[in-house]
């Protein structure tokens, strides 16, 4: 059935399953904004490796149904590229599979559960502008009954898994976007699944840093010479898309450093950085988190790292642009 699927790069960015060639598939969720992530499937000889589940059970079921229609291969391994819930909260729906993540990601996943997010959503109506923004970001997801299923295999550095005759290379590149980021490189398919090291046509969000690690990860991906690059969010891309994200990260680093050196506070710095070159990208308010993370990296011990403050800052920028 895979031959009947829309092929990259001919198809537009629409929801559903895409055949990437040689038994590799991607499942995309436009518009790629908050919570609308991508998954990947590598198949060979009746076996499959799944890269990431979705934010909730309904979206994960849709993804699994799409992949089953594309390939009957049995999912024997599930890789979670990092700790954010939109890449692992659906794990429990993948039965009888080894679940793999970096040790750093697995440690964080134990504390970042669906119940925690469901609690924030319940409280959001009484949280003013921050609550309004939180509902804007996450109100379309249903975490009812979403029991967390954590990785049972962890690694640091590199790990390989076989899928039939194919080798999948799991490469730790964090801390960058989060503390435990990894990518999945499939040389036989000339395809790399990057998790949230790549947001295509959307502003990346630097929860952890250092940003130099993220830039290095982009350069590593470019060096793999992959023909197809599946990001954590957004449409399938190539090396040019990777370079564009790398250049964004370098730009905000340099602009934030200029403002840090003048003594400007991080929120005002975030407000003042021109984003005209990235005007078509979604979720521009994430610049607030990125600048706060950069300021901490530069040595500002007062720059916030708590989610409540950072979501409040993003909410204010979101309101300003409405």
Give the positions of each predicted feature:
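Ligand/cofactor pocket segment of small-molecule handling proteins
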Residues: 157-159, 163-221
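Metallo-beta-lactamase
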Residues: 8, 19-20, 110-172, 188, ...
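C-terminal regulatory/interaction regions
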Residues: 1-6, 262-322
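Divalent metal-coordination and catalytic microenvironments
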Residues: 23, 42, 52, 67, ...
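Conserved beta-strand hairpin/beta-sheet module of binuclear metal-dependent hydrolase folds
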Residues: 17-66, 182-195
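Active-site neighborhood of phospho(di)ester-bond hydrolases with catalytic His/Asp-centered motifs
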Residues: 51-53, 76-82, 100-102, 173-174, ...
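Divalent-metal (often Zn2+) His-rich catalytic cores of metallo-beta-lactamase-fold enzymes
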Residues: 191, 213-272, 276
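Active-site metal-binding motif and surrounding structural segment of the metallo-beta-lactamase
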Residues: 45-48, 58-101, 222-224
């Amino acid at each position: 059935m895979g031959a009947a699927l829309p092929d990259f790069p001919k198809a537009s960015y629409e929801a559903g399953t895409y055949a990437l060639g040689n038994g590799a598939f991607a499942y995309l969720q436009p518009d790629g904004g908050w919570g609308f992530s991508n998954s990947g499937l590598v198949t060979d000889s009746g076996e499959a490796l799944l890269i990431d589940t979705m934010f909730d059970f309904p979206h994960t079921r849709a993804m699994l149904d799409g992949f089953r229609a594309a390939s009957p291969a049995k999912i024997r391994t599930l890789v979670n590229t990092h700790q954010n819930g939109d890449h692992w909260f659906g794990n429990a729906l993948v039965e009888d599979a080894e679940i793999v993540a970096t040790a750093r990601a697995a440690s964080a996943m134990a504390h970042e559960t669906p119940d925690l997010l469901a609690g924030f959503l319940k409280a959001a109506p009484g949280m003013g502008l921050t609550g309004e923004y939180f509902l804007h970001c996450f109100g379309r997801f249903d975490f009812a009954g979403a029991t967390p299923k954590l990785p049972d295999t962890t690694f640091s550095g590199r790990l390989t898994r076989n899928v039939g005759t194919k080798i999948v290379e799991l490469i730790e590149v964090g801390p960058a976007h989060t503390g435990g980021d990894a990518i999945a490189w499939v040389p036989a398919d000339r395809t790399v699944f990057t998790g949230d090291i790549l947001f295509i046509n959307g502003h990346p969000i630097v929860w952890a840093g250092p940003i130099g690690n993220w830039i290095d990860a982009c350069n590593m991906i470019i060096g793999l010479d992959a023909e197809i690059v599946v990001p954590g969010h957004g449409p399938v891309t190539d090396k040019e898309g990777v370079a564009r994200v790398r250049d964004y990260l370098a730009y905000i680093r340099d602009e934030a450093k200029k403002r840090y050196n003048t003594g400007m506070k991080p929120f005002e710095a975030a407000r003042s950085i021109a984003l005209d070159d990235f005007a078509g990208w979604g979720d521009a308010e994430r610049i607030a988190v990125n600048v706060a993370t950069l300021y901490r990296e530069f040595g500002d011990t007062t720059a916030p790292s708590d989610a409540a403050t950072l979501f409040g800052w993003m909410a204010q920028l979101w309101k300003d642009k409405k």
